[in-house]
Curated annotation (Swiss-Prot):
Disulfide bonds: none annotated. It comes from Styela plicata (Wrinkled sea squirt). GO terms for molecular function: protein tyrosine phosphatase activity. The lineage of its organism: Eukaryota, Metazoa, Chordata, Tunicata, Ascidiacea. SUPFAM superfamilies: (Phosphotyrosine protein) phosphatases II. Residues 1-109 form the Tyrosine-protein phosphatase domain. Substrate binds at residue 78. The gene is STY-4. Keywords: Hydrolase, Protein phosphatase. This is Tyrosine-protein phosphatase 4. It catalyses: O-phospho-L-tyrosyl-[protein] + H2O = L-tyrosyl-[protein] + phosphate. It comes from the Eukaryota. Its EC number is 3.1.3.48. Belongs to the protein-tyrosine phosphatase family. Pfam families: Y_phosphatase.
């Protein structure tokens, strides 16, 4: 798939329990078998982070690469619901813009 958008709605750890493994580098490159994930940039807002990665398949002789944007939402409390839905609406708007700019491929959630 040529998904260019990832939406992550959980933290790595919540209430002392691991919820998600960090599959992205904070800097440089992480390698998973033939797949390389290279950190490009991060934009932090109050309730979510936008990270850009370059994903490459080292076994592909054509040098295929994909720029992927991850939207990591931090505004959802561990228990209950957010006080305001405004930041979630902002997140959805930013994801929609990304989708339009990247070819409207499936979103990984």
């Amino acid at each position: 798939s040529k998904s260019a958008s990832i939406v992550m709605l959980t933290e790595l750890v919540e209430r002392g329990q691991a919820k998600c493994a960090q599959y992205w580098p904070n800097d440089g490159i992480l390698t998973f078998g033939d797949i390389e994930v290279e950190f490009l940039s991060v934009n932090e807002s109050e309730d979510y982070s936008e990270r850009d990665f370059k994903v490459s398949n080292r076994s592909d002789n054509n040098g295929s690469q994909l720029i992927v944007k991850q939207f990591h939402y931090h505004g959802w409390p561990e228990v209950g619901a957010p006080v305001s839905g405004y930041s979630m609406i902002e997140l959805v708007e930013d994801v929609q813009k990304q989708q339009q700019n990247s070819g409207n491929h499936p979103i990984v959630i």
